[in-house]
Design a protein with these regions (language model features):
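Solvent-exposed loop and beta-edge segments used for protein-protein assembly and interaction
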Residues: 80, 144-146, 403, 526-530, ...
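Extreme N-terminal leader/anchor segments
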Residues: 1-127
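Short, solvent-exposed secondary-structure capping/transition elements
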Residues: 95-99, 162-163, 381-382, 544-547
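Aromatic-lined, polymer-binding surfaces characteristic
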Residues: 79-80, 88-94, 102, 106-307
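Beta-strand-rich N-terminal accessory domains
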Residues: 388-452, 634-637, 643-657
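Extended repeat-based interaction scaffolds and adjacent low-complexity, acidic/S/T/P-biased segments
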Residues: 445, 451-659
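Residue-level detector of short, conserved catalytic/binding motifs and their immediate flanks
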Residues: 84, 148, 409, 534
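Carbohydrate-active enzyme catalytic cores, enriched for enzymes
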Residues: 120-135, 284-428
Length: 659
């Protein structure tokens, strides 16, 4: 059979990296798409775990990984992060092997547990203090996060580690963990760290009443964020991203499974199943997950949810489809420079990429990717390891999938295996200018462009009197130009969605974050094949206000991006111009097509329509040939696609409706 081969990212985005040590031969009979088996996963995990050994403190309490920047929690917390996150990988490795531990991982992490909890400290730095001591949880908030990995690792390896420890060590460890049971300082997925600590303490028979209360509080809190179709909002907001898989499903479903609580598993496991039904469509045929949302340096933590579905049986994926997805993604990162020559995971996507990071990102943050190794809990004979790989959705059909609960539209094409995501429902927890959420579209092979280069910049073409040099234009963005500066997309307000379309509204914001009073933008995306019809209805803007639509940010050796004016973009005769979009995880220098227009004098509402396309096909037909768009009445958009099928959508001040 013919098997798609992993696509290569641009050379500039693919630093030389090793494949985490010696890998076994490929098995193209069992794994025709990736060649990988469980042995490849074991070798990858072992390579990652052995590579961090030189950076351990004298008694293994901290793992102080190299890096140009510490997190805002400080170097001691970063060292705890190195211990906790790699311990989780070791726990998956040993527990899934029935306790076999030829590399001595548990002895090392057991020594670190004893040393780290012996004399916990409050100071964030490492100078002049016990080099192995852990930070105290009430004083170091990040330690709450890491307590979950410590507790889960201990729970998974309890017969081989916890049950063998000295009573004094266990008492100290419990004392260190207990504060994590309290309500968290951040009202989002952080509630689940207490749940995870509580689950371990319940298993260990320690402080069971307090532990159960923490579990119950956490489940009650996240239930209020469940929006249906397998999607949680990460707090009282509209934040939908990969935290659904690697936190909001990961912790409660794994807790229910380890507890043997069928009632809990029936509830949370079925939510996981629903989530995976759409989530599986977000993976490129080359293995890449969707670079959308925060904490993308966690990379293959995106595999936590698919593996969890296989572990618990709550999944729409067959065993062979699960392994093909998971092995495709892990191999994609290993093959594309996500592991350094020293065997470490740097801060970035493929290689190092600083613009992707958050303030809480430190040298050990990427090891949250350990969650993606959850599949190692499945024994050798599990069908997920033994059945023949099956293709991904992106390899079998062109499809546009509407995820109504999060307001996302997932568009995939089988000819190139490329996946695009159109965002009409998710907003950043950090503010409207965050490019990881604020763009209208994302894909598995592009952007977004870097925040410091692309948000609300001054454009000298629109403001000739300015002496500021333009740097880069935000990709996949629709903006008004106010005093020459592009407005940002305010918090996203979903207007509706249906087969092949999704719509939202926002209030544009200036560079300082202030809103444009009285101005609203209603936006919609209609998708079919590789074609996207992008629609924006502007109300409340002064006549003559410039507007701008941008397309996909691509490097010279990337996929082909196209943008075609349909209505409202009158500058330059409606012809797109090419502008720089700065760096992305896929290339240091990218560019995008750009359309310009102005708000007309007469109508109360101004409509702007374009056709966009992103494709890896060779010599693609122009975007204008992909759809015929006709406007009628009160902002009704009628689309006849290239294959003759049709779509209709009407935008109003408050709604988006389709027949």
């Amino acid at each position: 059979m013919t098997v798609p081969q992993p696509a290569q990212p641009p050379q500039s985005a693919r630093p030389a990296g090793r494949k985490t040590g010696a890998l076994p031969p490929e098995d193209r009979e069992r794994s025709p798409y990736t060649g990988w088996t469980r042995a490849h996963w074991e070798a990858t995990a072992d390579g990652l775990l052995q590579a961090v050994v030189p950076y351990a403190s004298p008694r293994n309490g901290l793992i102080n990984l190299p890096g140009a920047r510490p997190s805002w929690a400080g170097p001691r917390s970063d060292g705890l992060e190195g211990y906790a996150r790699t311990f989780l990988a070791a726990a998956f490795r040993v527990a899934g092997s029935g306790g076999r531990d030829p590399h001595g991982y548990l002895a090392r992490y057991g020594e670190g547990l004893a040393a780290g909890t012996e004399h916990p400290v409050t100071e964030p730095g490492l100078d002049g203090k016990d080099p192995d001591a852990w930070p105290v949880i009430p004083d170091t908030r990040q330690a709450i996060v890491e307590s979950a990995s410590v507790a889960l690792g201990l729970r998974l390896t309890r017969p081989w580690l916890w049950d063998t420890l000295d009573d004094k060590v266990r008492t100290r460890a419990v004392d260190w963990l207990l504060p994590a049971l309290d309500p968290p300082p951040i009202d989002n997925n952080w509630w689940l760290f207490g749940l995870t600590v509580g689950g371990f303490l319940l298993d260990a028979g320690v402080e069971t009443e307090r532990a159960q209360a923490s579990v119950d509080r956490a489940l009650e809190r996240i239930d209020g964020w469940y929006r249906g179709e397998g999607w949680y909002s990460d707090g009282d907001n509209q934040a939908f991203d990969h935290y659904n898989g690697w936190a909001l499903h990961f912790y409660p479903v794994l807790h229910a499974h380890l507890s043997g609580d069928r009632a809990l598993l029936d509830t949370y496991g079925e939510r996981l199943r629903a989530h995976l039904d759409g989530y599986r469509r977000m993976f490129d045929a080359n293995g890449a997950p969707m670079p959308f949302g925060r904490s993308l340096t966690y990379r293959f933590a995106t595999l936590a949810a698919p593996w969890l579905g296989a572990l618990t049986g709550h999944t729409p994926l067959s065993p062979g489809a699960t392994r093909r997805l998971a092995s495709g993604t892990l191999r994609h990162f290993v093959d594309h420079g996500a592991v350094t020559d020293e065997g470490l995971l740097p801060l970035g996507w493929y290689g190092p990429y600083a613009p992707m990071l958050q303030g809480y990102s430190g040298p050990a943050s990427p090891y949250w990717a350990s969650k993606g190794l959850l599949g190692l809990l499945l024994p050798d004979g599990h069908p997920a390891w033994t059945e023949r790989e099956e293709p991904l959705p992106a390899e079998t059909e062109d499809a546009v999938t509407t995820l109504r609960a999060p307001g996302l539209l997932v568009q995939a094409t089988a000819s190139d295996g490329l996946v695009r995501l159109h965002n009409h429902g998710s907003s950043s927890v950090f503010g409207p200018a965050d490019p990881n959420y604020a763009r209208f579209a994302y894909s598995t092979r592009t952007g977004p462009s870097a925040a410091e280069e692309a948000v609300a910049i001054v454009d000298t073409a629109a403001n000739p009197g300015s002496d500021t040099t333009p740097v880069a234009t935000p990709d996949n963005h629709f903006a008004l130009l106010v005093d020459g500066a592009s407005t940002g997309r305010g918090p996203v307000e979903p207007l509706g969605s249906g087969p092949g379309w999704a719509a939202s509204a926002h209030t544009p914001r200036r560079a300082d974050g202030s809103e444009l009073a009285g101005v609203r933008v209603r936006s919609a995306t209609l998708a079919h094949g590789r074609a996207e019809v992008r629609v924006h209805l502007v109300t409340g803007a002064a006549p003559g206000t410039p507007v701008r639509q941008t397309g996909w940010a691509v490097p010279d050796d990337g996929p082909t991006a196209q943008l075609h004016a349909v209505h409202g973009f009158t500058q330059d005769g409606g012809q797109p111009r090419t502008v720089p979009t700065g760096s992305t995880p896929f290339g240091e220098h990218t560019r995008t097509a750009c359309l310009d227009g102005t708000v007309p004098d007469a109508p109360e509402a101004a409509l702007f329509v374009s056709i966009a396309s992103l494709t890896a096909e060779a010599d693609p037909a122009p975007a204008r040939t992909l759809a015929e768009v006709r406007l009628s009445g009160s902002h009704a958009i009628h689309v006849t696609w290239k294959d003759g099928t049709t779509s209709t959508l009407t935008l109003t001040a408050d709604t988006a409706t389709a027949p």
